[in-house]
C-alpha cells in the first residue's frame, strides 16, 4: 500500500489545483498516524487516501485491498447552495482527474502494478459535512497488488507429523 500512497501523493503534487507540498499539505494517508492533520493545517482542496481491509482473490493467492479516495474542500458559507455545489463539482473533477490519470495507458506502462486497479463496481458518494464545512467526493474501489500475497511458503517450519497433544 506504500507504493499506492506515494503514487497518489505524487499526483496530488502534480495536479494544478492541488500542488501538494510539505509546507502546503493537500494530501494525507489515513492509515499513517504521522499524516494525520487537523482541518486547520490542511490546504484545500484536500486529498485523503486510506484502506479498510482486503478480500482474498478467487485463486486464494492475493489480497484485493478496499481503498478509499476522497477529495474535499472547505466552503465559507454552508448556507450558500451555489458555493457548496461549486465545491462539490470542483472536487468531483479533481477526483476524476486522478482516476483517469491512474487508468491511462501511459501511467500503466510506467507503473505496471496499476493493472491491479479495479474501478468496476466502484462506488462514489458526495460528501456534505456541514459541521466542518467540508464538501467533496469519496470513492471506494479495489486494487490487487502483485506483491501482496496471502500465501508464503517460508512461513512455516518443517511440518511435524505429531499433533502437539500427542507424546
Locate the predicted segments by residue.
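Extracellular/virion structural assembly segments
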Residues: 2-9, 60-64, 72-100
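Small/polar-rich, solvent-exposed N-terminal microdomains that initiate assembly or binding
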Residues: 1-60, 153-167
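Acidic-leaning, charged glycine-interspersed low-complexity segments
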Residues: 1, 16, 20, 40-47, ...
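Short, surface-exposed linear patches
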Residues: 50, 69-71, 89-94, 161-166
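Generic alpha-helical propensity signal that fires on short helical segments
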Residues: 65, 87-89, 155-161
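Oligomerization/assembly interface segments of phage tail-like spikes and tubes
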Residues: 61-77, 132-147
